[in-house]
């Protein structure tokens, strides 16, 4: 039987579940729809963007009735950045989502029965504060459209850099360090690595913070096999840290 639904059709959809990547799942006209940025419990106006035989994809046109699990996100970039797809979901519901994801994978891939998991699998232990807890972060370096040096994170399923000044999951010191590195690169004519041309020096900045020691390790991941290139990267140590190890 041919479906009446066509691409760009607009329809009301209740989100009743969430997929493994945090997308909302709803059912309409005998089809299952996957909707980015929709949360379980939302009632939305959706626009069909891609249709298959029994399922399709849609985007949110309007949230008609917000889910009771929907909260105000801490980061305005959560929809674009590839790391916080479910930040608009309450933390308690995030834990439930992650628990179900692990549980379903153990049954589907590991072959465990529901009874086995009921007896052996413990619920996840949540953090007292789900922000500012990550002691390690790696930031790709590149250019924005105006030719300015930027650091940030990759957009979902791409290597396009979303400029991030201060990720709420990492420590506040990251922003200051990244600002110093960008200033150093601009002043010294140091270029970011370009994945298309394979030219440029600085690929990533890795920062690790010791919550106990209060020490910070900064690693510049560079595209340079010559000692001179590495020395140019090592010059940043005068600004960034007390000591520097230069590997040749």
Residue map of PLM features:
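Accessory RNA-recognition modules of RNA-modification enzymes
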Residues: 2-246
